[in-house]
Amino acid sequence: EWVPDIWIEDVFAACKRAPQHTYLFLTKNPQRYLDMGHAGKLPMERNFWYGTTITGPETEYFGASCVNTFLSIEPLLEPFSADDCAGFRRLGEPLWVIIGAMTGPGSKRKQPKREWVAAITEVAQSAGVPVFMKNSLKDLWGGPLIQEYPEGMVRVDGE
């Protein structure tokens, strides 16, 4: 909230001048997206993706059918039940889910369980939502990481 709207609007304007790129905007304050949307200040460009960082099922997030939205569940600190995962649709289905573990000092004490990651992945994929597992899950997952991208999003390697 300490960031003035004009700063955010300036970033959006700069991004609009380079439409060949895909932009991921990530916040822990999803109310800001709602406020900007109600004020007519949230661009609805096809290459703009609005994400919310959440760490558990109780965290509020932004979802809207008129813009590209995603969830960044990182660090995953607690399990999501099937009901919690189905609740992703309460504000509009995210078009992408990113999952990651805590990294850095002290992170070994706060690692998610594999079944937590599997539950989120299963619900997302059954709804047709691509899942991207961050490299921080490599040891926990035990197999090749699922690293899917939304349809139409250009990957860094150009695919």
Task: Identify what each model region corresponds to.
Residues 1-132:
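Conserved AdoMet/S-adenosylmethionine-binding subsite of the radical SAM
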Residues 137-159:
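C-terminal accessory extensions appended to soluble enzyme cores
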